[in-house]
Amino acid sequence: MNIEVNLVNSFTVNGKGGNPAGVVLNSDKLSDAQKLKISQAVGFSETAFISNDDEADYEVSFFTTTGEVDFCGHATLATFSTLFQKDILTAGSYVQRTRIGILPVTIEPNGKVIMDQQLPQKLDCYSYKEISSVIGIKSSILESTKLPIEVISTGLPDVVISVPNGYLDLIKPDDELIANFCEKHKVIGFHIFELC
């Protein structure tokens, strides 16, 4: 079976950088097992699969290399950008069905995609010490930010971690510890950012 996968970067600046996602059109006849296999072959954090829907304009499912997730923001942007660039959709307002519900998406005349998502929910907090060993930085450095380490969800639960200016390039994340932490605490991943 040959399946065309569009490789799209969201959040680019002047066509550079961004967050990559796979986008597969006409996915109605694909099983979840096939979607997972395709996602594993693509190897990006998420691949979006577009299917027809009776109530929404499209149903969009999102798969990582390990399984389906409820929602993915950058893959949503990639999905509707692809539909616009391929002249399947024009500028306007649309709705997509995801595992978290029906969400609006707008495509502006210049092709910019704007999406609505759930309001952020704070789900949990972790100690500086607990996180420091996982990302390879002293707990005192994390604590110096005076910001909590929280699980925030707008559809997927992520651990949000701030580090002081100059420390982002110094962290040494342990991929195995992160994977184990995420599985144990039912979170998707870590979002680490540097304070200015």
How would you describe each model-predicted region?
Residues M1-F71, L77-C196:
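Active-site proximal loop and beta-alpha junction motif in alpha/beta enzyme cores
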